[in-house]
């Protein structure tokens, strides 16, 4: 074989190996929704508090989520709990100590703030925004204890079990722009350190928790038929204070009508 042909063959083989080395672990081709004109601002954080202290697996955590409304919901601009340096964990913290200002300002049940984070199931639900075709993202999900990342119902990162702060890394390719359904699951049931971080990096960049602009919350962007919305308790139907006199007058009128009959 001529030297020039050998060179071309060697170069082609090297390129093929390079492409194979960069092949994503998972590929998603069809977005759940169209990409909005605005950037994202985080996922919908959900808490199921004071759960069974023997909740030690993702399967148990998912059963709790499926079994009833979330105790509280809020806007999670980043998945970084407790907020701090990468890999930071804490012991026996309350929600009031670990939720950032945005989370506390958007919390729909402030009664949870004095609660200890132990014996808790969390879900961060919404969508991941892809701006260009063929984006390849590297995701990592270190946690203490168990966690998982699901994209369009596929478990991309599985970090199940009781363990110290650590987690897997996977690459994901999105072939089309749009919003892709995303859930981050987490549970903590042991009286010890706990923590959770979702990190992402585009096209080989070092993964970081600063990906808020790619995260779109469930409440604002989900289709009304999205079954994840069923975990959010409907608003209390108690009338507004200004409407109470009108309601009272209406009831008195009804009673008077019935009495005359």
Identify the meaning behind each predicted range.
Residues 24-237:
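Acidic/polar, compositionally biased interaction segments
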Residues 239-258:
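A short, hydrophobic C-terminal helix/tail in secreted or cell-surface proteins
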Residues 2-9, 242:
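Bacterial N-terminal signal peptides that target proteins for export
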Residues 10-18:
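Bacterial N-terminal signal peptides
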Residues 19-23:
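Sec/Tat signal peptide C-region and signal peptidase I cleavage site
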């Amino acid at each position: 074989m001529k030297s020039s042909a050998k060179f071309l063959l060697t170069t082609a083989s090297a390129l093929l190996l390079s492409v194979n080395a960069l092949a994503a672990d998972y590929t998603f081709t069809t977005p759940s929704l169209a990409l909005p004109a605005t950037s994202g601002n985080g996922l919908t954080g959900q808490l199921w508090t004071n759960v069974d202290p023997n909740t030690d697996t993702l399967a148990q955590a998912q059963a709790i989520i499926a079994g009833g409304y979330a105790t509280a919901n809020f806007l999670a601009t980043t998945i970084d709990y407790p907020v701090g340096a990468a890999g930071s964990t804490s012991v026996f913290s309350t929600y009031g100590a670990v939720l950032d200002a945005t989370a506390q300002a958007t919390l729909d049940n402030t009664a949870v703030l004095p609660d200890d984070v132990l014996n808790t199931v969390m879900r961060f639900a919404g969508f991941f925004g892809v701006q260009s075709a063929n984006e390849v993202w590297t995701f990592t999900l270190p946690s203490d204890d168990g966690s998982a990342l699901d994209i369009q119902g596929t478990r991309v990162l599985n970090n199940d079990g009781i363990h110290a702060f650590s987690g897997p890394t996977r690459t994901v390719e999105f072939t089309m722009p749009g919003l892709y359904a995303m859930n981050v699951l987490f549970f903590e049931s042991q009286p010890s350190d706990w923590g959770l971080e979702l990190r992402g990096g585009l096209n080989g960049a070092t993964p970081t928790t600063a990906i808020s602009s790619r995260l779109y919350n469930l409440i604002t962007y989900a289709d009304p038929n999205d079954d994840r919305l069923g975990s959010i308790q409907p608003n209390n139907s108690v009338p507004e204070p200004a409407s109470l006199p009108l309601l009272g007058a209406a009831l008195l009128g009804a009673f008077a009508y019935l009495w005359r009959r």
